[in-house]
Amino acid sequence: MSGERAKRFPLALEDLKREPRKPEGRVAERQAAGDAARQRLTAAAAVPAAASPIVPERRAPHGGVFAAKPARAKQHAPAAPGAAKRAPQGGAKQGDRSAAPNVALSGALALTSERVRERMVERLRANGVADPRVLAAMSAVPRHMFVDPGLAAQAYEDAALPIGHQQTISKPSVVARMIELAAAGRALERVLEIGTGCGYQAAVLSRVARDVYSIERVKPLYERAKLNLRPLRVPNIRLHYGDGRVGLPAAAPFDAIVIAAAGLDVPRALLEQLAIGGRLVAPVGEQAGEQVLTLVERVAPAQWRESRLDRVFFVPLKSGVI
C-alpha cells in the first residue's frame, strides 16, 4: 500500500481480517447494557412505593412536616410566655435551646411574684389596711428586687429581712401601716423618709406622694438603694446621703415624715420641718425595751399632738454618717 493510500485508508489487511472477532464483544456489551436496563426498570418499578411518603415533605413549608416544631413550642408557651416569643429565633442552634430554660424560669418567677404580691395585699387588707392607694402601691412594687437573691423566696412574707450593715427591710404590714397613717386619706405633696435602707419603702411612698425625699446615713446602703431603684425608673424620688436626725431643711416643709428607725424621742429638727397639718410617723423607745409606733400631728406653729399606737421593733436611730 502506498503512503498516500495508507493516509486515506489507515486500516491494513490484518485489521480487516480481525474485525469479525469484535461482534462477540459488542454482544456482551449489549447483554450487559440490557441487564443494567432491566435492573433500572426493576428499581424504577419499586421507587413509587418507597417515594410516595416523601411527597408531603416537599409541601411541608406550607404547613406540613415542619409545622410540628412550632406546635411543640406552643405547648411550652403557657409556662414561659417569654420563651415562646424567642422560639422562632432559636432554630437549630444549641446555644439558643440551652438558654430557653432560663427564660422560662425568669417568666415563671415574674408570674409568681405578681401572684404572691396579690396574696400579700389580701393579707394586708384583712389586717385592716384600707387606703386603696397604699394597697395598690404595695401590689405594684416588687419587694423581691430589694432583698438579696437568697432571700427572694421570703420577700412577700410578713417578715423583716436583713439587708446588711445591721439594718433590715421592714415587714410589709409595718410599711403599709406607717404610710397609711402618714397619708390619712390626704393627697400628699412632699414626703420625707428617714432611713432609706434598700429603697423599698421609698418606692412604695413614690406611688402615694408627688415627691419623696429620702435620707440614708450608711453610704453602702445609699448606693444600694440607688441601684435597686434604677430599674424601676422612679422619677419622683430624691435620695440623699446624710444624717437623718437633721432632716432636709432646704426642702421643708413636708406633708408627712416617716422615720424607719427607733429613737428615744423624735428629733426636734424633724418636728420643725413638718408642715402645719402634717403628720409624722415613727417608732419611739429603747432598743432593748418597748418600742411604740407613734403618730405626731402638727396642729399649730408651736403645737404638736402625739398618739401612741402599736408595739413595734426597729433598728436604732443614730446620728452622723458612715
Swiss-Prot record:
Catalytic activity: [protein]-L-isoaspartate + S-adenosyl-L-methionine = [protein]-L-isoaspartate alpha-methyl ester + S-adenosyl-L-homocysteine
Pfam families found in the cross-reference section: PCMT
UniProt region (Disordered), positions on chain: 1-101
Signal peptide positions (record): none
Basic and acidic residues biased stretches: 14-29
EC number: 2.1.1.77
PROSITE patterns tied to this protein: PCMT
Biased composition annotated in UniProt, kind: Low complexity: 33-51, 76-91
Top-level division of the source organism's lineage: Bacteria
First-tier enzyme category under EC: transferase
UniProt KW Zinc keyword: no
Any Gene Ontology biological process: methylation
Catalytic residues, chain numbering: S170
Compartment(s) of residence: Cytoplasm
GO molecular function: protein-L-isoaspartate (D-aspartate) O-methyltransferase activity
Cellular component GO terms held in the UniProt record: cytoplasm
InterPro entries from the UniProt entry: PCMT (IPR000682), SAM-dependent_MTases_sf (IPR029063)
Keywords: Cytoplasm, Methyltransferase, S-adenosyl-L-methionine, Transferase
SUPFAM superfamilies linked: S-adenosyl-L-methionine-dependent methyltransferases
Described purpose of this protein according to its UniProt entry: Catalyzes the methyl esterification of L-isoaspartyl residues in peptides and proteins that result from spontaneous decomposition of normal L-aspartyl and L-asparaginyl residues. It plays a role in the repair and/or degradation of damaged proteins.
Family designation: Belongs to the methyltransferase superfamily. L-isoaspartyl/D-aspartyl protein methyltransferase family.
HAMAP family attached to this UniProt entry: PIMT (MF_00090)
The name this protein goes by in its record: Protein-L-isoaspartate O-methyltransferase
Originating organism: Burkholderia pseudomallei (strain K96243)
